A protein has these predicted regions:
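Alpha-helical transmembrane segments and their immediate juxtamembrane cytosolic regions
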Residues: 1-366
Length: 366
């Protein structure tokens, strides 16, 4: 078996740090705002590595087992949506978990049945953006349009599939190609920004050409940078964050919302970034230690059925927004620490031959 490429964990780790910068729920000006805009491309790195890890699973997993798992991944993932929007409207918006599910399944089908050559992945990635940019807004409303095309907010199929496909290309291409792509996209970004920069061009949901160029620059730049390192220290905190990036996703957001609720948003922004990062790192260690005592209870379908029902039911029966956030955060963290058990259960239910547990779509080892 090919040795695991730790650069994937490193890329996920840096995207975790960028998430903290991007998700502080305050609006800043000057240098801090520039950092926030650039950090907003963190999902691009998430999705890119998810595309890569999917291709590594094609020969080891059946589509049926992936389909069952990612349907539940998307549903339980609404816990994350509900932390941002603690009401039933959250079910109408595509966020990180839902687009990961769609992106992973799409890459799997593409890789397994079409086996496109390397550069076709790049062309398909750009074609996805072209469909978003030139076709999506011209179409009339139709059922599930908010899943396929961006309307207001959310990570819809077009244009965000581009990052999954682009990640596969970046991983398989030589590092020289990654450097060239970084320089070309960065140069084009400078050219299109020469006449002035409008912040409206950097709203990630309704992806513009400047935002695409920024995303490509960061995506290929990250693959170029982290693949230059031949080895990583096992105890590297960046790898730890990348390895447990799904848990990081829920933990950091819960802490950001909690600190904001406590009024800590008045602190200097750099102090808030550091506070959230340290508390997230420590909190993940505590949660994973505690999970050793409860993981065994999630090796059966019944507790997972309870988790799925709870994610959906909480905003329907609980009127208090803070309590919704707390309960959905707990459910999301529980899922993030124990998704392997669910993956194994889904594999066993589809095939009598027990398949290996699914690697974390947002950064676990394969």
């Amino acid at each position: 078996m090919k040795p695991y490429d730790y650069s994937l964990d490193a890329i996920k780790g840096i995207s975790c740090i960028l998430m903290i910068i991007a998700h502080i729920p305050l609006y800043f000006h000057g240098n801090e705002r520039v950092f926030q805009i650039v950090a907003g491309v963190a999902p691009v790195l998430f999705f890119a590595v998810s595309g890569v890890t999917t291709t590594l699973q094609v020969k080891r997993r059946s589509f049926g087992s992936l389909l069952g798992f990612y349907v539940l991944f998307a549903v339980i993932g609404f816990a994350y949506n509900l932390m941002w929007r603690p009401d039933v409207q959250a079910f109408r918006i595509m966020d990180v978990p839902q687009i990961i599910a769609l992106g992973v399944l799409s890459v799997y089908l593409l890789e397994k049945y079409l086996k496109p050559p390397l550069y076709l992945y790049l062309l398909l990635s750009l074609a996805v953006f072209a469909v978003h940019s030139f076709i999506g807004h011209r179409l009339p409303d139709f059922p599930l349009k908010s899943v396929v095309f961006t309307e207001t907010v959310g990570f819809t199929y077009f244009p965000w599939l581009f990052a999954f496909l682009g990640g596969v290309f970046a991983y398989r291409a030589s590092n020289r190609v990654n450097l060239i792509m970084t320089l070309v996209a960065g140069g084009m970004l400078v050219v299109v920004s020469y006449g002035g920069v409008s912040e409206a061009d950097y709203v990630k949901y309704n992806m513009s050409m400047p935002y695409l160029l920024l995303s490509i620059t960061v995506l290929f730049g990250a693959f170029y940078l982290f693949r230059r390192f031949k080895s990583y220290a096992p105890a590297n905190p960046l790898l730890y964050a990348g390895k447990h990036s799904l848990l990081f996703l829920f933990t950091h957001l819960f802490l950001i919302l909690a600190f904001d609720r406590l009024g800590l948003g008045r602190l200097y922004i750099v102090l808030i970034w550091g506070l959230v990062l340290i508390c997230t790192y420590v909190g993940m260690h505590i949660l994973l230690w505690f999970n050793r005592y409860i993981a065994q209870y999630l090796e059966h379908f019944l507790p997972w059925a309870v988790i799925v029902i709870s994610v959906v039911a909480v905003p329907l029966v609980i009127p208090n927004r803070d309590l919704i956030i707390l309960m959905e955060a707990a459910l999301g963290m529980l899922f993030a620490m124990n998704y392997k058990q669910l993956s194994s259960l889904m594999s066993a239910s589809v095939s009598p031959r027990r398949e290996p547990a699914l690697p974390e779509a947002v950064g676990e080892r394969v």
